[in-house]
UniProtKB/Swiss-Prot annotation:
Post-translational modification: Phosphorylated. Phosphorylation at Ser-737, by the cAMP-dependent protein kinase PKA, triggers ubiquitination and proteasomal degradation of OFD1. Also increases its interaction with TBC1D31 and regulates its function in ciliogenesis.
Organism of this sequence: Mus musculus
Alphabetical keyword list: Cell projection, Cilium, Cilium biogenesis/degradation, Coiled coil, Cytoplasm, Cytoskeleton, Nucleus, Phosphoprotein, Ubl conjugation
Name of the protein described by the UniProt record: Centriole and centriolar satellite protein OFD1
Coiled-coil segments on the chain, per record: 188-557, 626-659, 895-966
Underlying gene: Ofd1
Phenotype of gene-disrupted mutants: Females die at birth and display severe craniofacial and limb abnormalities associated with disorganization of the brain, reduction of the lungs, defects in the great vessels and cystic kidney. Primary cilia are absent on the luminal surface of glomerular and tubular cells of kidneys. Males die earlier during development of the embryo, display failure of left right axis specification associated with a lack of cilia in the embryonic node.
Amino acid sequence: MAQSNMPHKSDVLSQDELRKKLYQTFKDRGVLDTLQTQLRNQLIHELMHPVLSGEVKPPSISVEGSALLIGASNSLVADHLQRCGYEYSLSVFFPESGLAKEKIFTMQDLLQLIRINPSSSLYKSLISGFDKENKKGFLMSFLKELAEYYQAKESCDAETQTSTTFPSQVSLAEKFQLIDAQFADGFPHRSKLESLETKLNEYKKEVQHQLQVEMCHKLKYFREAEITKVKMEERRKYEKELAEFQNEFERTCQAKNEALISQEKNSLERIKKHREMESKEIYAQRQLLLNDIALLRGREAELKERIETFELTQKLQEEKIKSEAEALERREQNLKNIEDTYDQKLKTELLKYQLELKDDYITRTNKLLEEERKNKEKTIHLQEELTVINSKKEELSKSVKHMKEVELELESVKAQFLAISKQNHLLNEKVREMSDYSQLKEEKVELQAQNKLLKLQLEETRNENLRLLDRITQPPPELVIFQKELQKTEKAMELEHKDFETHRQALEKQLQSEIENSAQLRTQIAEYDASVKRLTVQVAELKSQLKQTQIALENEVYRNPKHSLIHSLSGLLLSGKMAPHSEDKSGDFLNVPLEQNKVIAGAVMSRVPPYVNTATEASSPESDFEFIASSTKAKVRELEQEAERLEKAFRTYYQRATQNPSTSPQPAKSPPSVNSVAALRSIASSSMDRPVSAEDRVVSEQPLGDMLKEEMSDMSKAFMGSVVSRPRRTSSSTRLSSTPHPKSRRSLDNEMYLEGLGRLHMTSSSPLLDRVSASPAASPSPCPERTAQASPVPSRHSFSGLPEQNACLYQRQTETQDKSELSNVDKQSLKDEKFEPPFRWNKTEQFEAEGLHPAGDMPGIDFAVATQSSRLISYDYPSAVQSQTGEQDEQELWELHMKERRQREEQRHNERQEALERERRELGKLEQERRMIEESLKMEMEEELEKSVQDQKDKSAHCENTLEKYMKIIQQRQEESNADKSSKKSGKECSLVDMMMPSDKDESSPGFSHEEPDDMW
């Protein structure tokens, strides 16, 4: 390119050689492309503005048409140059035409401009050819299509002088020729001295170059044509293969569909069979479920009442929890407001500090400029100041670290403040519950001390912040860094707060799950209570049936009395089988009351005939009445025979007792009396195999000395006052209780033997005592108040004989007892705790020594009273029985009915109290669980706070503050106090549970008390 400026030097190198050498050097150095672009730009500028050369520039070709057509033609040319690989001309064309690569028109746009119909064959062939042959440009394909179109139409019938060439205004070749001519005019003409050889060589090269270009174009055209043919053939082959593949695929799909349809039919049949089986099973299960539902509906009706009460308690607890949550939210809002005020204060202080720093920085910069202008000698001084500034920077970094530590301490103080606020809230609630003013004052003093310490620490932190702000002497960029660090710390605090909230939510979920578990437990307890109530109802029905049978039996026996039964009973006690040996007669038989009581119990129980299926037969009282009447009439003869022996034995026994009054045991002092009472108790309790009730335990575990003294004195006075006019009629009831077995039924088991003994004693003692005090001519009982005070509780039991000692005493006492029992029920449960341990110890020692076990089913005075009353009745006044009238029998029956009604009312009252106490226990358990959960939450919160404080301590190199130590001491004290309170509460609740467990067992005990008296007959 630059060889035209160089003079011809035949001595050194020719033009061609120099051109080749320059080309090679530029190419090796990698400067060829840049040099070509520079030369192109220069050429274009010189052609456009040939100012330096004095020649006139050729006139520019005016292009007619719109800008859109010009852009379309330019895009056609650019596309053609790009497709053909004419990079040089393309690089020249883009800047000359003002066209950008992004603004080139697409083929669809060009066809739309030319207004070729999209449905025409030309449009379709151009688009298909462009898609297939991306190497060719739009211009080449368009010209090819036009040539083929016009070649097909060259043969015409009429000869016309028309050319098939496409007319155009100016071709590209003409433009290039004009450019070459202008370029040639710009350069100086070659010298005429050039040889013809050089010209010929140049022409040859040009011709060869043109031939090569033409050959290349022809080869490209030939290749493209062959490639299109091959592509068409391959496309046809692929279409055939695709059609075959589609057919095969459709066949396989049809076969698969048929197989699937058959499988579906089989599966549907199986499913139908399975559904039929399931429907049958479901129907059977449905019937079972309907039966269960019918049972459960009955339970639901009972459970609704308990659920309502539970919902009321739950609502109260929810209201308490809501109030606590509102208080916590208010405190959180207060804390947020305090934090906002602190943040605003910090921001204002930082702004003030920034302004001060800016002012200081401006003044210092001015001073430094003045000092630099004045003297160059102060450079050394400035260097020293730089060292000082560096040291200050280090101090600043240290202060920043210290600030971070202080902020961490602030966070810990805030967390501690939150914990302290929660503790204050809990302490306030405890103070409301306990109303301990001394503890309140102490806690207030402690909290005030804590607040003072917190305020002091906050003031110290503020002072430290102010000191650090005074120390900082750095330009604003460092302040920006410091603000970023503050923002990071605030974000970290927010993340920690979020973690704390998530943990709190998890703990609340645990609380809800535990509450649900407690609700399930309550439902189970309610079901258990319902089953217990059903059993109690059944037991009450059985009791009523048994009482009816007893009343019928007594009425039948009263109609057919036998007068000599009381004498037969007294004679039987000292007859051949029951009397002690000669060894015992020599040494006072009454001094061994335990053995005496054992012998009496064995004698009486050997004659107790059992009746089978009393519980089942009690459902029909008329049939029972007929059966018992027939059996009693048949056995009266046997009773008359044994009555004579009993009378003889009783008379001899009473004579020996009156002859030896000094050796008779006193129940207040002598331990054998206690042993005799314990013997009968152990027999009755072991025979019935049931737990001892709490009220019986109260009676049996009172101090026996005072009780036995009072009752024996009262009974002796009552007997002495009523001896004169005592009726003889009372022997009928003793005959009822002491009717013997026939000989065929005397070989019974030990269990029936002992059960009959217990029932015999209670039924025989109560009518005797009733007859002792029921005579109308007898003087009024001298000490009814003392007897009522000595035994207020046993009147509520079916086994107690003291309330049935006399009718007049009972009528006077019941009015006072019914009033006092309602208030004494809670007191008696507390007396159990007082009297139980010492008396149990004494009983176990005595009974283990004699091989017996304690039982609280009978009061200890029954046996002594029964023996004394039977003694007095049978010995002194044997003729008073015949003067008894039928009216007194009816009155006694009415009194028995009244007693039974009162006992039922008392039992109902006891059951209600037991239900209330159970509910109290359940509430106590729920409160205990809630407190345990709150304590666990407190412990977890405290552990988290301690962990955070320990982490902060590990990060900071400082020692523990006095405030933290003080807080730890307070927390330890609170934990110890909480542990002590929880242990006390758990101990109280355990004692209450121990107290109330016998009351739960009492529900089953009355069932035995009224079911088994029929065994006497």
